[in-house]
């Protein structure tokens, strides 16, 4: 669990000006203080938005705070270091790349908070240099020593004895040397292409004959383990426990091993220097869908181009010489402002390998999801269809098992001879997806199967293309959605013959049909046989597979046409109901739980609700551009963020005065509301809305461990040190363990 005394290391003073606050030590990066902002009724000030890029970096800083929290199990802390690194990689590949493109094209479109692309890039560079250094220091000064205390060592070549060096010499010659390609640079050998996110050694070699020096590059193979484990040499003994304890693990980074054998790679030369470096390339591309008849081929062409995207970041070891850096800047065409200098190891995303060690005592207590009570097998197992005919079911993953609910729903539909058709959207799915295999089996059994596979899902394009082809080969009707839009909704429709009638069964969720991430992501889903939702999903799939453009639905809000308008309309209705009931009753309440809150129109609607006296409570995992708690326009808005063992991924919206609960796939962002097909469904069953209400109350409990957003844009750990505290996710796990 996250400690209230956050970031407990010697360097935490760099990160704070007072207890429990994270922010950059550069005051120019801070958002305007609340005192500079005021507004009268129905007026909204110009500085009402927080910068979305800075807000994202703040989110990643909260992830880093978990890594620095010494109350968490040690390998969980290493995992959060890896997550931080992967997050930052993607941020540069997409967000920074997009800002650079706009800056280079002189598209001086300002952000909602008034910054040009260049100003944002400057701010990002300063913030990133600070937080990347902090990331490295948390590893070097806190996590790495703690690993050593538990018998897990990441060592250097100089730490090894002769027996270990002999062992690694054999390993290098047999397993590593054959796959390495040293690339020298001279008039006959141009500077080599450096692939994005690859780890490399920049080497200077000297010719003994004339003393001339040449640059060479060695790529660290990405198809072998980053950390080479040495043979176990003993055990950590816990004499008080009376057992032998755990084996000692000693790892050498692969780049250290290669560096030790550079003379083997460059025989007859003197190795003058070597330094690690890594570049990040632009991976933000678009397919001109309206100009290409074959979207699949167009996407594959763009994927091939992605690896040649322009560099957007150069990470270097902090011991790199100026001359070596100047050469890399020149040859890679990188601006000095895009250089991130890192002490210690580059690319800590590789710590996933260390997390994979079989050391359960250093990880979170195991949690096994339970089967939803409605689907639990008793004396006579009942089909999911029979259960849904009795009433709707709300599943909450990972606390409820995905395999025994959503996955079983689709598998039963596949095996049921009375099922005529299955229609499903697929955005991201697992590599050995049981969902996709079930759809293939259904098609081979003669059922009508439609799969909308979103092949433009970023960084999952290749996997989705493979699945699309496998589905087509099995006879599934595969479509790629609507031109110009990504299909991000999570929907499944099963059509079943029941006597003389046809009944439709549906699933609408907030998370992907991915059995692996369903164990790690927190999501909710509605399983129902309600006729109005069945009719809505029929219309939606007809719109996705045909040329119809359905705009109004019975029980759904559908982007890109209906969600923003529908949410703002309900905010306005909540305000009206609040006024009608009398502001003193405090009836007006809007609660939102989501991944990101950025859309200016939705934010402005919430500001106006606050001005009318409606209380607004927001639980946001990542980006939040809304400035809460400011007199005159947002004093009734409260924002918090919950991070922990599971990734909080569900989207839930509640309007108390008008008594409506909505769940679905959409965050309040431009891309979700304007450039994606998203679905929000209203949950009407009082049993289910009570469950959603309980979930929101737990997340918003004053004693729940969280981060709270201040008017100046800084995030504060809450509750404060010494106060009673509860963990939202742990509370839910204990409730399910006790069943």
Swiss-Prot record:
InterPro entries assigned to the protein according to its UniProt record, in alphabetical order: PP_kinase (IPR003414), PP_kinase_C_1 (IPR041108), PP_kinase_middle (IPR024953), PP_kinase_middle_dom_sf (IPR036830), PPK_C_dom2 (IPR025200), PPK_N_dom (IPR025198), PPK_N_dom_sf (IPR036832)
Keyword Phosphoprotein: yes
Compositionally biased region (Low complexity): 27-40
Post-translational modification: An intermediate of this reaction is the autophosphorylated ppk in which a phosphate is covalently linked to a histidine residue through a N-P bond.
Catalysed reaction equations from the record: [phosphate](n) + ATP = [phosphate](n+1) + ADP
Keyword set includes ATP-binding: yes
Region annotation Disordered: where it falls in the sequence: 22-45, 714-739
Annotated binding of Mg(2+), by residue: 428, 458
Cellular component GO terms held in the UniProt record: polyphosphate kinase complex
One Pfam short name: PP_kinase
Keywords: ATP-binding, Kinase, Magnesium, Metal-binding, Nucleotide-binding, Phosphoprotein, Transferase
Residues annotated for ATP binding in this entry: 87, 521, 621, 649
GO MF terms, alphabetically ordered: ATP binding; metal ion binding; polyphosphate kinase activity
GO biological process, one term: polyphosphate biosynthetic process
Main EC class the enzyme belongs to: transferase
Cofactor(s) demanded: Mg(2+)
EC assignment: 2.7.4.1
Biased composition, class Basic and acidic residues, residue ranges: 724-739
Active site positions, chain numbering: 488 (phosphohistidine intermediate)
Function: Catalyzes the reversible transfer of the terminal phosphate of ATP to form a long-chain polyphosphate (polyP).
UniProt family annotation: Belongs to the polyphosphate kinase 1 (PPK1) family.
NCBIfam families linked: poly_P_kin, PRK05443.1-1, PRK05443.1-2, PRK05443.2-2, PRK05443.2-3
Protein name: Polyphosphate kinase
Organism, scientific name: Mycobacterium leprae (strain TN)
